[in-house]
């Protein structure tokens, strides 16, 4: 069920992060944003400075192995960083210390920070 509000979409190069057949994948970064390209960050902190979020797509949460689960407690915690100087953002999975990376059609966690463009989308 689609909700009204603000969503985030993540892109790198010519690809957008998306849900493909119930799994995390990519789609071409062009045209209008689709529902399967929209994500919500759920803040897990207690103090305003806390940088810890669960990433949700609909009623499912992104896990540390980049699969999806309906169980929020099994969702991975991520930190979102501004890379500065217009170089985009990076999303670090906190348990592994690795960064969410879009490489062609693949989504992986890598040791080196990647550059993600983040788009705020209102439906």
Model-derived segments and their meaning:
Residues 1-123:
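Lectin-like carbohydrate-binding module/patch detector with strong preference for beta-trefoil
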């Amino acid at each position: 069920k689609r909700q009204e509000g603000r969503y985030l979409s993540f892109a790198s190069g010519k690809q957008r992060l998306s849900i493909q057949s119930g799994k995390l994948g990519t789609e071409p970064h062009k045209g209008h944003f689709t529902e399967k390209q929209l994500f919500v960050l759920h803040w897990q902190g207690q103090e305003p400075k806390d940088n810890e979020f669960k990433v949700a797509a609909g009623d499912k949460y992104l896990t540390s192995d980049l699969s999806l689960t309906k169980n929020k407690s099994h969702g991975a915690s991520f930190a979102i960083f501004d890379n500065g100087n217009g170089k985009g953002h990076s999303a670090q999975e906190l348990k592994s210390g690795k960064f969410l990376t879009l490489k062609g059609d693949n989504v992986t966690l890598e040791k080196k920070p990647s550059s993600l463009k983040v788009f705020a989308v209102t439906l």
